[in-house]
């Protein structure tokens, strides 16, 4: 039994893996700067996971990172990731909505382009070499990844976002599989509902008149 399996057994042994939605392994250092096959398999049992936090565990690559299709939130802060293999994230986590990669060693801002196939809504990239001393990086990240609404707790207007947890964010986004169910879409849905109700009432009225 590897240390990940031991940790999971000690903390979640009473639960089936499919019942767990959140796992936090912050400061839980990997032995070889990436996951092993055994560790990957251990975590892939958690098929309904929504939130995975792997902050400060010594990762230098995404090799053998577990593939969890349900994942909504991934935090990889304070590791040693360069971003050269960020193209793997789309395949591993196709539903990913929020990504934290601050405090890594990303020098090439272009590596963020590898995240474009994702429909990310929020990203945290501060404290990387490309962002230090660069007061225009937030705008550039918005330009590179057009689905984003928040970069480093800042929206496109330069306003600071209100703090929410990932549970609330997921509920807010239940109406849209892309995680972008906004007020305009909600208004459109309400209009459709009203139209359907009016049509239903008209049909009932016609039926009543015909029966008379």
Regions found by a protein language model. Give the residues of each.
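Leucine-rich repeat
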Residues: 17-19, 45-48, 65-71, 91-95, ...
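The feature captures the LRR N-terminal capping module
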Residues: 1-53, 130-212
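Recurring C-terminal helix/loop segment of individual leucine-rich repeat
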Residues: 12-15, 38-44, 60-67, 81-91, ...
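Residues that line or immediately flank small-molecule/substrate-binding pockets and catalytic motifs
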Residues: 27, 56, 66, 78, ...
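A conditional alpha-helix N-cap/helix-loop micro-motif detector
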Residues: 1-5, 55, 82, 102-105
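Canonical position 11/12 of the leucine-rich repeat
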Residues: 28-37, 58-60, 78-86, 96, ...
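Conserved hydrophobic beta-strand positions in leucine-rich repeat
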Residues: 21-26, 47-54, 71-76, 97-101, ...
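Ankyrin-repeat and related helical/solenoid repeat scaffolds used for protein-protein interactions
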Residues: 89-129
